[in-house]
Amino acid sequence: GASNVAANLSNLISEVKLYGELALDVSSDEVLELTKEHGIQCRISHSLNVTPVKTRFVGNEGQHILRLDVEIPNSKNRQIETPTEKILKDISVGDIVIVSDYNKGSIEKDTVQKISDITDLIFVDPKQEPEIYNSAFLVKPNMKEYLKWNGEFTTDSAIQFMNKHNWTWLVLTDGANGMH
């Protein structure tokens, strides 16, 4: 998820920092090693008891057949500094912040607002209600998520929805139909 985004970014720009939550276990060691190979600075909070593991089963032709996710919901130890607290200490005016929200509790209702008090360049891959992302520069839901939020898709309704949430850009991914 977020590690893949960070790895791809590290091929484009020189300084990438990754914030998130992992446990102190073998799976988190693998994530940290991969990010190190890509020159990514890790600012990971070790606040989970078990690191979520995603296993993809791939066919002979490279097609994904199945993905198995293993995680323990609500396995957090909130005595440790959160990713949001770390981000707020690190970012400056003009920094670009990419928020990959998996709705696991790392992105709180005021996270984007707090970040936007420092920098305007916030790009969001959302999973929660749209109000959480007010003031983001770009929000990129898939069409299913957007229709759940807004009920319909027309260019005019999308512009109104974008303005309502103070987003500069709204990009909808729509499978085989591309992006809107």
Labelled PLM ranges:
Residues 43-49, 56-91:
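Conserved phosphate-binding/catalytic loop of the ribokinase/pfkB sugar-kinase fold
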Residues 17-21, 43, 96-98, 123, ...:
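A structural signal for isolated positions on well-ordered beta-strands in alpha/beta enzyme cores
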Residues 10-18, 60-65, 141:
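Conserved thiamine diphosphate
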Residues 9, 97, 138, 142:
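Residue-level signal for inorganic ion chemistry
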Residues 1-52:
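Substrate-binding N-lobe of the ribokinase-like
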Residues 106-180:
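Conserved phosphate/ATP/ADP-binding segment of small-molecule kinases
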Residues 91-106:
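Short acidic, glycine-rich surface-loop motifs adjacent to enzyme active sites
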